[in-house]
Amino acid sequence: MQQDEVIWQVVGHEFCSYRIKGEAQNFCRNEYNVTGLCNRQSCPLANSRYATVREDNGKLYLYMKTIERAHFPSKLWQRIKLSKNYAKALEQIDQQLLYWPGRQIHRCKQRLTRLTQYLLKARRLALKHQPALIPIKPKQAHREASRERKALIAAKLEKNIEKELVKRLKSGVYGDQPLNVNEEIWNKVLAAREGLIDEGEEEEEREEAELEFVSDDEDEEEISDLEDWLGSDQSMETSESEEEESSESESDEDEDEDNKGKIRKRKTDDAKKSRKKRAPHIHIEYEQERENEKIPAVQHSW
Protein backbone atom coordinates (compact mmCIF):
# COMPACT_ATOMS: atom_id res chain seq x y z
CA MET A 1 0.00 0.00 0.00
CA GLN A 2 1.25 3.45 -0.92
CA GLN A 3 2.18 5.73 1.97
CA ASP A 4 2.28 9.38 0.89
CA GLU A 5 3.87 10.65 4.12
CA VAL A 6 6.72 8.15 3.96
CA ILE A 7 7.43 9.06 0.35
CA TRP A 8 7.46 12.78 1.17
CA GLN A 9 9.87 12.31 4.08
CA VAL A 10 12.32 10.60 1.76
CA VAL A 11 11.80 12.81 -1.29
CA GLY A 12 11.19 16.14 0.44
CA HIS A 13 13.79 15.97 3.21
CA GLU A 14 16.52 13.64 1.98
CA PHE A 15 17.02 13.41 -1.77
CA CYS A 16 15.00 13.90 -5.00
CA SER A 17 16.37 13.85 -8.54
CA TYR A 18 13.71 16.33 -9.72
CA ARG A 19 14.48 19.00 -7.13
CA ILE A 20 16.20 22.27 -8.14
CA LYS A 21 17.42 24.28 -5.17
CA GLY A 22 16.93 28.02 -5.15
CA GLU A 23 17.79 30.82 -2.75
CA ALA A 24 14.22 31.44 -1.53
CA GLN A 25 12.36 28.37 -2.79
CA ASN A 26 12.96 24.97 -4.37
CA PHE A 27 11.58 24.01 -7.78
CA CYS A 28 10.51 20.71 -9.34
CA ARG A 29 11.20 19.70 -12.93
CA ASN A 30 8.90 16.68 -13.03
CA GLU A 31 6.74 16.86 -16.17
CA TYR A 32 3.56 16.01 -14.20
CA ASN A 33 3.98 18.77 -11.59
CA VAL A 34 1.04 21.17 -11.92
CA THR A 35 2.72 24.26 -10.39
CA GLY A 36 6.46 23.61 -10.83
CA LEU A 37 7.13 24.11 -7.11
CA CYS A 38 8.65 21.59 -4.75
CA ASN A 39 6.19 21.24 -1.82
CA ARG A 40 3.87 18.66 -0.23
CA GLN A 41 0.69 19.65 -2.14
CA SER A 42 2.37 19.98 -5.57
CA CYS A 43 4.55 16.84 -5.54
CA PRO A 44 3.21 14.22 -8.01
CA LEU A 45 5.18 11.43 -6.28
CA ALA A 46 3.94 12.02 -2.71
CA ASN A 47 0.23 12.35 -3.68
CA SER A 48 -1.71 9.22 -4.63
CA ARG A 49 -4.58 11.36 -5.97
CA TYR A 50 -3.25 13.92 -8.40
CA ALA A 51 -4.35 15.81 -11.56
CA THR A 52 -2.56 18.07 -14.06
CA VAL A 53 -2.82 19.50 -17.60
CA ARG A 54 -0.17 18.87 -20.28
CA GLU A 55 0.40 19.90 -23.91
CA ASP A 56 1.35 17.40 -26.64
CA ASN A 57 1.83 18.53 -30.30
CA GLY A 58 -0.39 21.59 -29.86
CA LYS A 59 -3.16 19.69 -28.09
CA LEU A 60 -4.13 19.86 -24.39
CA TYR A 61 -4.80 16.80 -22.23
CA LEU A 62 -6.03 16.31 -18.66
CA TYR A 63 -4.02 13.72 -16.70
CA MET A 64 -5.47 12.08 -13.56
CA LYS A 65 -3.91 9.63 -11.09
CA THR A 66 -5.88 7.59 -8.54
CA ILE A 67 -4.96 5.14 -5.78
CA GLU A 68 -6.80 2.30 -7.52
CA ARG A 69 -4.26 2.23 -10.39
CA ALA A 70 -1.14 2.59 -8.23
CA HIS A 71 -0.21 -1.09 -8.67
CA PHE A 72 -0.25 -0.70 -12.53
CA PRO A 73 2.61 1.60 -13.52
CA SER A 74 1.66 1.37 -17.23
CA LYS A 75 -1.91 2.45 -16.43
CA LEU A 76 -1.11 4.87 -13.61
CA TRP A 77 -2.21 8.05 -15.46
CA GLN A 78 -5.56 8.48 -17.20
CA ARG A 79 -5.50 10.92 -20.16
CA ILE A 80 -8.51 12.92 -21.39
CA LYS A 81 -8.35 15.22 -24.43
CA LEU A 82 -9.57 18.78 -23.83
CA SER A 83 -11.44 20.93 -26.34
CA LYS A 84 -9.73 23.75 -28.27
CA ASN A 85 -12.39 26.10 -26.98
CA TYR A 86 -11.26 27.54 -23.68
CA ALA A 87 -14.73 27.66 -22.12
CA LYS A 88 -15.53 24.07 -23.05
CA ALA A 89 -12.16 22.94 -21.71
CA LEU A 90 -12.97 24.53 -18.32
CA GLU A 91 -16.31 22.71 -18.27
CA GLN A 92 -14.57 19.41 -18.98
CA ILE A 93 -12.21 19.95 -16.03
CA ASP A 94 -15.15 20.66 -13.72
CA GLN A 95 -16.93 17.51 -14.87
CA GLN A 96 -13.91 15.19 -14.53
CA LEU A 97 -12.77 16.63 -11.17
CA LEU A 98 -16.21 16.88 -9.66
CA TYR A 99 -15.32 15.25 -6.28
CA TRP A 100 -11.75 16.44 -6.08
CA PRO A 101 -10.38 19.08 -3.71
CA GLY A 102 -11.07 22.65 -4.81
CA ARG A 103 -7.38 23.61 -4.61
CA GLN A 104 -6.46 20.87 -7.11
CA ILE A 105 -9.20 21.97 -9.54
CA HIS A 106 -8.10 25.61 -9.35
CA ARG A 107 -4.46 24.72 -10.09
CA CYS A 108 -5.47 22.67 -13.16
CA LYS A 109 -7.51 25.60 -14.48
CA GLN A 110 -4.58 27.97 -13.98
CA ARG A 111 -2.30 25.63 -15.90
CA LEU A 112 -4.91 25.36 -18.68
CA THR A 113 -4.98 29.17 -18.96
CA ARG A 114 -1.19 29.45 -19.23
CA LEU A 115 -0.92 26.73 -21.87
CA THR A 116 -3.76 28.25 -23.92
CA GLN A 117 -2.02 31.63 -23.98
CA TYR A 118 1.23 29.94 -24.94
CA LEU A 119 -0.41 28.14 -27.90
CA LEU A 120 -2.11 31.32 -29.16
CA LYS A 121 1.17 33.22 -29.13
CA ALA A 122 2.94 30.38 -30.96
CA ARG A 123 0.26 30.42 -33.70
CA ARG A 124 0.61 34.18 -34.16
CA LEU A 125 4.37 33.92 -34.48
CA ALA A 126 4.00 31.11 -37.04
CA LEU A 127 1.79 33.33 -39.21
CA LYS A 128 4.32 36.17 -39.22
CA HIS A 129 7.16 36.15 -41.72
CA GLN A 130 10.45 35.83 -39.90
CA PRO A 131 13.90 36.11 -41.48
CA ALA A 132 15.81 32.87 -41.76
CA LEU A 133 18.77 32.65 -39.44
CA ILE A 134 21.92 31.42 -41.18
CA PRO A 135 24.93 30.46 -39.08
CA ILE A 136 28.09 32.38 -39.94
CA LYS A 137 31.57 31.19 -39.18
CA PRO A 138 33.57 33.47 -36.86
CA LYS A 139 36.54 33.68 -39.24
CA GLN A 140 34.32 34.65 -42.16
CA ALA A 141 32.53 37.28 -40.06
CA HIS A 142 35.86 38.73 -38.92
CA ARG A 143 37.12 38.81 -42.52
CA GLU A 144 34.00 40.60 -43.77
CA ALA A 145 34.18 43.12 -40.95
CA SER A 146 37.82 43.93 -41.78
CA ARG A 147 36.95 44.36 -45.46
CA GLU A 148 34.11 46.74 -44.62
CA ARG A 149 36.40 48.74 -42.37
CA LYS A 150 39.05 49.05 -45.10
CA ALA A 151 36.44 50.04 -47.67
CA LEU A 152 35.16 52.81 -45.39
CA ILE A 153 38.70 54.11 -44.89
CA ALA A 154 39.31 54.16 -48.65
CA ALA A 155 36.01 55.95 -49.27
CA LYS A 156 36.83 58.60 -46.67
CA LEU A 157 40.29 59.09 -48.20
CA GLU A 158 38.83 59.60 -51.70
CA LYS A 159 36.30 62.08 -50.36
CA ASN A 160 39.03 64.02 -48.54
CA ILE A 161 41.12 64.18 -51.74
CA GLU A 162 38.12 65.39 -53.70
CA LYS A 163 37.38 68.09 -51.14
CA GLU A 164 41.01 69.23 -51.12
CA LEU A 165 41.07 69.52 -54.93
CA VAL A 166 37.85 71.51 -54.93
CA LYS A 167 39.26 73.86 -52.31
CA ARG A 168 42.42 74.42 -54.36
CA LEU A 169 40.42 75.14 -57.50
CA LYS A 170 38.24 77.63 -55.65
CA SER A 171 41.22 79.31 -53.99
CA GLY A 172 42.98 79.77 -57.36
CA VAL A 173 46.05 77.62 -56.75
CA TYR A 174 45.96 76.36 -60.35
CA GLY A 175 45.26 79.78 -61.88
CA ASP A 176 42.19 80.75 -63.84
CA GLN A 177 41.92 77.34 -65.45
CA PRO A 178 43.57 74.01 -64.76
CA LEU A 179 45.88 72.44 -67.33
CA ASN A 180 43.39 69.93 -68.61
CA VAL A 181 40.84 72.66 -69.44
CA ASN A 182 43.05 75.03 -71.50
CA GLU A 183 42.85 73.94 -75.16
CA GLU A 184 45.89 75.91 -76.33
CA ILE A 185 48.26 73.72 -74.34
CA TRP A 186 46.82 70.56 -75.85
CA ASN A 187 46.99 72.05 -79.36
CA LYS A 188 50.70 72.80 -78.89
CA VAL A 189 51.36 69.28 -77.71
CA LEU A 190 49.49 67.78 -80.67
CA ALA A 191 51.34 70.03 -83.14
CA ALA A 192 54.69 68.96 -81.69
CA ARG A 193 53.70 65.29 -82.01
CA GLU A 194 52.64 65.78 -85.66
CA GLY A 195 55.98 67.45 -86.45
CA LEU A 196 57.88 64.51 -85.00
CA ILE A 197 55.80 62.08 -87.04
CA ASP A 198 56.48 64.03 -90.29
CA GLU A 199 60.24 64.05 -89.63
CA GLY A 200 60.22 60.31 -89.07
CA GLU A 201 58.39 59.71 -92.35
CA GLU A 202 60.91 61.88 -94.29
CA GLU A 203 63.84 59.93 -92.82
CA GLU A 204 62.24 56.66 -93.90
CA GLU A 205 61.75 57.97 -97.44
CA ARG A 206 65.40 59.05 -97.61
CA GLU A 207 66.55 55.64 -96.48
CA GLU A 208 64.43 54.00 -99.16
CA ALA A 209 65.74 56.38 -101.87
CA GLU A 210 69.41 55.57 -101.19
CA LEU A 211 70.93 53.32 -103.85
CA GLU A 212 73.23 50.43 -103.26
CA PHE A 213 75.86 49.43 -105.85
CA VAL A 214 76.81 45.79 -106.13
CA SER A 215 79.48 44.46 -108.52
CA ASP A 216 78.87 41.53 -110.79
CA ASP A 217 82.01 39.36 -110.67
CA GLU A 218 80.47 36.45 -112.53
CA ASP A 219 80.42 38.30 -115.90
CA GLU A 220 84.10 39.19 -115.63
CA GLU A 221 85.02 35.58 -114.86
CA GLU A 222 83.04 34.37 -117.88
CA ILE A 223 84.81 36.87 -120.16
CA SER A 224 88.24 35.79 -118.90
CA ASP A 225 87.40 32.11 -119.48
CA LEU A 226 86.23 32.93 -123.00
CA GLU A 227 89.43 34.80 -123.76
CA ASP A 228 91.58 31.90 -122.54
CA TRP A 229 89.67 29.42 -124.65
CA LEU A 230 89.87 31.64 -127.73
CA GLY A 231 93.57 32.29 -127.18
CA SER A 232 94.37 28.60 -127.38
CA ASP A 233 92.77 28.32 -130.89
CA GLN A 234 94.06 31.62 -132.33
CA SER A 235 97.25 32.05 -134.34
CA MET A 236 100.03 34.13 -132.98
CA GLU A 237 99.65 37.81 -133.84
CA THR A 238 102.33 40.41 -134.21
CA SER A 239 104.39 41.63 -131.28
CA GLU A 240 103.04 45.16 -131.59
CA SER A 241 99.45 44.07 -131.28
CA GLU A 242 100.40 41.93 -128.26
CA GLU A 243 102.13 44.82 -126.56
CA GLU A 244 99.16 47.09 -127.22
CA GLU A 245 96.76 44.48 -125.92
CA SER A 246 98.91 43.78 -122.85
CA SER A 247 99.15 47.48 -122.03
CA GLU A 248 95.42 47.92 -122.48
CA SER A 249 94.68 44.82 -120.40
CA GLU A 250 96.98 46.05 -117.59
CA SER A 251 95.29 49.42 -117.56
CA ASP A 252 91.90 47.69 -117.51
CA GLU A 253 92.98 45.41 -114.70
CA ASP A 254 94.16 48.36 -112.66
CA GLU A 255 90.86 50.07 -113.20
CA ASP A 256 89.02 46.88 -112.30
CA GLU A 257 91.01 46.50 -109.09
CA ASP A 258 90.32 50.10 -108.14
CA ASN A 259 86.65 49.62 -108.88
CA LYS A 260 86.63 46.41 -106.84
CA GLY A 261 88.24 48.15 -103.85
CA LYS A 262 85.73 50.97 -103.99
CA ILE A 263 82.86 48.57 -104.39
CA ARG A 264 84.02 46.51 -101.39
CA LYS A 265 84.19 49.63 -99.24
CA ARG A 266 80.74 50.59 -100.39
CA LYS A 267 79.55 47.08 -99.61
CA THR A 268 80.81 47.24 -96.03
CA ASP A 269 79.34 50.71 -95.49
CA ASP A 270 76.07 49.72 -97.09
CA ALA A 271 75.91 46.51 -95.04
CA LYS A 272 76.28 48.51 -91.82
CA LYS A 273 73.60 50.96 -92.94
CA SER A 274 71.28 48.14 -93.92
CA ARG A 275 71.71 46.53 -90.49
CA LYS A 276 70.85 49.78 -88.76
CA LYS A 277 68.18 51.11 -91.11
CA ARG A 278 66.83 47.84 -92.51
CA ALA A 279 65.96 49.53 -95.81
CA PRO A 280 65.12 47.54 -98.97
CA HIS A 281 68.08 46.63 -101.27
CA ILE A 282 68.24 47.74 -104.92
CA HIS A 283 70.62 45.84 -107.22
CA ILE A 284 71.97 47.66 -110.30
CA GLU A 285 74.11 45.94 -112.88
CA TYR A 286 76.56 47.83 -115.08
CA GLU A 287 77.77 46.52 -118.42
CA GLN A 288 80.97 47.92 -119.87
CA GLU A 289 81.60 47.82 -123.62
CA ARG A 290 85.21 47.90 -124.75
CA GLU A 291 85.55 49.43 -128.21
CA ASN A 292 89.33 49.14 -128.52
CA GLU A 293 89.42 45.44 -127.63
CA LYS A 294 88.77 43.20 -130.60
CA ILE A 295 87.54 39.68 -130.20
CA PRO A 296 88.60 37.49 -133.09
CA ALA A 297 86.11 35.31 -134.86
CA VAL A 298 85.70 31.81 -133.60
CA GLN A 299 85.79 28.96 -135.97
CA HIS A 300 84.78 25.56 -134.89
CA SER A 301 85.40 22.44 -136.78
CA TRP A 302 83.04 19.76 -135.74
Curated annotation (Swiss-Prot):
Gene3D superfamilies, per this entry?
Answer: 3.30.390.110
Q: Where is this motif: Nuclear localization signal?
A: 138-143, 274-282
Q: Does the keyword Cytoplasm apply?
A: yes
Record bears the keyword Cytoplasm: yes
A single GO cellular-component term from the record reads: nucleus
Residue spans of biased composition, Acidic residues class: 198-230, 239-258
List GO BP terms, alphabetically: assembly of large subunit precursor of preribosome; maturation of 5.8S rRNA; maturation of LSU-rRNA
Q: Where in the sequence does UniProt note compositional bias of the Basic and acidic residues kind?
A: 282-294
Which InterPro entries did the record assign? Mak16, Ribosomal_eL28/Mak16
Q: Where in the cell is it found?
A: Cytoplasm; Nucleus
What ranges does the record give for the region Disordered, renumbered to this chain? 198-302
Instruction: For this UniProt record, give its keywords in alphabetical order, as a comma-separated list.
Output: Cell cycle, Cytoplasm, Nucleus
Family from the record: Belongs to the MAK16 family.
Q: What is this protein called?
A: Protein mak16
Q: Which gene encodes it?
A: mak16
